[in-house]
């Protein structure tokens, strides 16, 4: 990462010419899933601060809110700010009130849905073209070739620049890439989530596909450890994840303590160490830690010494 007071370095994401900051900003927690939505003026200020600090990749999805996170970014990117960023959003997960009440979600990847979702995101973001458009989850009922075929048409129509996949298998990535170049695959990758290293990471690298690592701080646990749970509201879905349950918490607490010990030796914070590990995986990897606080963003952008 860049030293304090300098701009964030750039990396090539994929093989189609997309260039982004070596670290992006995940915007989900500003509007959804990690407790109640945060005050809009504060989040717009945070987004502007990130951009002014050199971050160019902003990540959202139509399911965050749902919809309100895209609307927030649309407001934040007024007044010439849009031209300074690469805006990534996603489609495919439907989480209406009735689904939310049942703790369920639907996944859609049929052509009509893809097109309608794209048009709706363009409207909410108040833009003419989405820079990077991911299929958020793969619809197993629809061949990936059909979904990507529709995305390809949207690229040809100028509504999308680049196509991505999120949480896709290695075989699905190959099949999709054969229809239209996939620029990036988004996946969970961190010190405590490494299952993607066996097949998916090698496949992306073989095909020249960029890697966007979400939850590089272990959904906040690698920053705060067990105390993260103390202030969680009932609206915070992390409260119900297996890794945060009592039967797993002791092992994860031990992992966090080891990270803290290493961070002390390095002269950095646990979150800086965790991010340094992700950056060290290669210059084709862009982590997108999320935050709702400017002080956390500043900390996340400082390098871990000797990282």
Swiss-Prot record:
GO cellular component terms given for this protein: cytoplasm
Name of the protein: Auxin-induced protein PCNT115
Induction annotation: By auxin.
GO MF annotation list: aldo-keto reductase (NADPH) activity
Disulfide links within the chain: none
Signal peptide: none
Keyword flag NADP: yes
InterPro entries recorded: Aldo-Keto_reductase, NADP_OxRdtase_dom, NADP_OxRdtase_dom_sf
Annotated positions binding substrate: 136
Residues at which NADP(+) binds: 215-225
Family: Belongs to the aldo/keto reductase family. Aldo/keto reductase 2 subfamily.
Record-annotated active site: 64 (proton donor)
Site feature: Lowers pKa of active site Tyr: 90
Transmembrane segments: none
Biological-process GO terms, alphabetical: auxin-activated signaling pathway
Keywords assigned: Auxin signaling pathway, NADP, Oxidoreductase
């Amino acid at each position: 990462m860049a030293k304090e007071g300098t701009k964030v370095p750039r990396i090539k994401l994929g093989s189609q010419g997309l260039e982004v900051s070596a670290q992006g900003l995940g915007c989900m927690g500003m509007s959804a899933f990690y407790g109640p939505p945060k005050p809009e003026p504060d989040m717009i200020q945070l987004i502007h601060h990130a951009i002014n600090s050199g971050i160019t990749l902003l990540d959202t999805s139509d399911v965050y809110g749902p919809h309100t996170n895209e609307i927030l970014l649309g407001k934040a990117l007024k007044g010439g700010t849009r031209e300074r960023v690469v805006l990534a959003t996603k489609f495919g997960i439907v989480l209406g009130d009735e689904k939310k009440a049942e703790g369920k979600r639907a996944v859609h990847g049929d052509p009509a849905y893809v097109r309608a979702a794209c048009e709706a995101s363009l409207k909410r973001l108040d833009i003419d073209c989405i820079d990077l458009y991911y299929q958020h989850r793969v619809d197993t009922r629809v061949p990936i070739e059909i979904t990507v075929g529709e995305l390809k048409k949207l690229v040809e129509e100028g509504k999308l620049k680049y196509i991505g996949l999120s949480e896709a298998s290695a075989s699905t990535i190959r099949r999709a890439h054969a229809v239209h170049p996939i620029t990036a695959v988004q996946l969970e990758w961190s010190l405590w989530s490494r299952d993607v290293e066996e097949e998916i990471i090698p496949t992306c690298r073989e095909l020249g596909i960029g890697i966007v690592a979400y939850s590089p701080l272990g959904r906040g646990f690698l920053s705060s450890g067990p105390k993260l749970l103390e202030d969680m509201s009932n609206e915070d879905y992390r409260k119900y994840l297996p890794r945060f349950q009592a039967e797993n918490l002791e092992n994860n607490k031990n992992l966090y303590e080891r990270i803290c010990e290493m961070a002390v030796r390095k002269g950095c914070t646990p979150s800086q160490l965790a991010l340094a590990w992700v950056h060290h995986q290669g210059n084709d990897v862009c982590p997108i830690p999320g935050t709702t606080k400017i002080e956390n963003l500043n900390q996340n952008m400082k390098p871990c010494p000797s990282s």
